[in-house]
Amino acid sequence: MKIVTDSGSDLTKEQCQELGVTMLPLKVQLGERTYLSGVDLSAEEFYELLDTTGQMPLTSTPSVGEFVDAYTKLAESDREILSIHISSGLSGTSNAARVAAKQVDADVTVVDTLTLSSGTGWQVEAAAHAIKAGWGKE
């Protein structure tokens, strides 16, 4: 089983690699610049920019197409995919993941964590450890 999450989980690239998790970045716009969260903007840098610019960021979810691409690639080695995302009450990420899940030839289960940041990250970590221990989605 493969795991997909978004950068709203606040897991680092290194943590995702260690856990075998695919992370899709949220897009963050501050002023005239757009960043890929977790790729070219770390959580620490994000908070520093908030402090120094005094601006509120605009964010956007990974696109349905980005989810389709990720699911399709992962399904080449394992058709079972667990897609764990930040709260649907705060972001459209879970919805984009659900739409994409219907477009791929894979068994994708989308989990709306109803939280964000480390709350989502902990759920991703727990799922990764459970999969390594041989547990199924149930």
Regions of interest found by a model, annotated:
Residues 8-9, 86, 113-116:
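Short, ordered loop/turn segments at secondary-structure junctions
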Residues 38, 55, 59-63, 85, ...:
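Catalytic cores of large soluble enzymes that bind and process phosphate-bearing ligands
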